[in-house]
From Swiss-Prot:
Residue stretches spanning the membrane: none
Keywords: Actin-binding, Cytoplasm, Cytoskeleton, Repeat
One of the record's GO molecular function terms: actin binding
Keyword hit for Cytoplasm: yes
Region (Disordered), start-end ranges: 320-345
Chain's role: Actin-binding protein involved in motile and morphological processes. Inhibits actin polymerization, likely by sequestering G-actin.
Main location: cytoplasm
Family as reported in the entry's similarity comment: Belongs to the actin-binding proteins ADF family. Twinfilin subfamily.
Subcellular localization, as worded in the UniProt entry: Cytoplasm, Cytoskeleton; Cytoplasm, Cell cortex
Domain ADF-H: 4-139, 177-312
Name listed for the protein in its UniProt record: Twinfilin
GO cellular component: actin filament; cell cortex; cytoplasm; myofibril; plasma membrane
Length: 345
């Protein structure tokens, strides 16, 4: 199945989306009906966004029926108000529904205007669609606050203490390489990926503190994947590749290690190379079953054909028979041998 479903907004939805940008609508519910994006319901602004959230959102969601929700926040951006896009795809939805809604979300963002959508939430349970669920999502993904000068001094002091404390935040050497600790934000992002909030994560190694940070988390179309790969720095990438193979729908985690040649420092190349295997073990411990590990030096390599070929190599159905080599030329006539007297006895 292609990554673009061909589904587009109908005329009614196009008018509603245009009206929504004037700031009077709080909620727009969008459903896929008859192979079209259509407006199922709207709600006007009543109070502030937090007090409107559960009151307006709850009645619009059906327990087993997926939909999109465009929710207007009160924060302002240069274009107008910022919007939250909620993808409500319950676990009970069919595989086809999950595929169609996942593949059509980018189209909805384009129809509405991606610049207006400043936040996204992927929900599979009704609890995740509540205001508290949204706040928890924000807390889980919030990056840790930078250390104060005093905290930095205490950190350095602990490094010089006589006893050594080994924990998940301690870098250590393993047989497979160097295990760098993950930041809290990195762990939260991976957990969100497993829950379905994202399908793409990018990681960087802070060479000074030797920790792995999440540098980007999003829902990314495969066609836009090559643009995520930096041309001047190494990175790790984790992508949920949704595809069909021999008629079966599959979701496969693909891990990509990108290293743009010798534009990176020697230390950067060594760190990314040494940390890769332990990092994959950490991902496995967090519930990520990586099906394929790839190494590239250019983002343009990440095409659908390339990933399919790596995940499902083409089988050779016909093997030509091994041809018996010919003997050397000019061997002369075949010699006849006379039987000996012993053979005649």
């Amino acid at each position: 199945m292609s990554h673009q479903t061909g589904i587009r907004a109908n005329e009614q939805l196009a008018k509603v989306l245009g009206k929504a940008k004037n700031g009077k609508l709080r909620v727009v519910k969008v459903s896929i009906e008859n192979e079209q994006l259509s407006c199922s319901a709207t709600a006007d602004v009543k109070k502030d966004w937090e007090r409107d959230y559960d009151k307006l959102l709850g009645p619009l969601l059906e327990e087993t029926v997926p939909c999109y929700i465009l929710y207007r926040l009160d924060a302002k951006i240069p274009l107008g108000h910022s919007w939250l896009l909620i993808s409500w795809i319950p676990d009970t939805a069919s595989i086809r529904q999950k595929m169609v809604y996942a593949s059509t979300k980018a189209t909805l963002k384009t129809e509405f205007g991606s610049a207006y959508i400043t936040e996204e939430l992927h929900a599979t349970t009704l609890e995740e669609t509540t205001l508290e669920g949204y706040r928890k999502h924000k807390r889980d993904f919030a990056a840790p606050a930078p250390l104060t000068t005093r905290e930095e001094e205490l950190k350095e002091l602990r490094k010089t203490e006589v006893h050594t404390e080994i924990s998940t935040n301690t870098r250590h050497q393993t047989l497979g390489g160097i295990s760098c600790p993950l930041t809290d934000a990195t762990v939260a992002a991976v957990q969100d990926l497993v829950r379905g909030n994202y399908d793409y994560l990018q990681f960087r190694i802070d060479l000074e503190e030797e920790r792995i940070h999440v540098s980007h988390a999003a829902q990314v179309e495969l066609s836009a994947l090559p643009k995520q790969v930096p041309e001047d720095h190494a990175r790790y990438h984790l992508f949920l590749f949704r595809h069909t193979h021999e008629g079966d729908y599959q979701e496969s985690y693909v891990f990509v290690y990108s290293m743009p040649g010798y534009t990176c420092s020697v230390r950067e190349r060594m760190m990314y190379s040494s940390c890769k295997a332990p990092f994959l073990e950490q991902l496995a411990a967090l519930g990520v079953d990586v099906v394929k590990k790839l190494e590239i030096d250019n983002g343009n390599e990440l095409t659908e054909a390339y990933l399919l070929d790596e995940l499902h190599p083409k089988k050779i159905l016909h093997r030509p028979a091994f041809a018996k080599p010919k003997g050397p030329p000019n061997r002369g006539a075949k010699r006849l041998t006379r039987p000996s007297n012993e053979d005649q006895v």
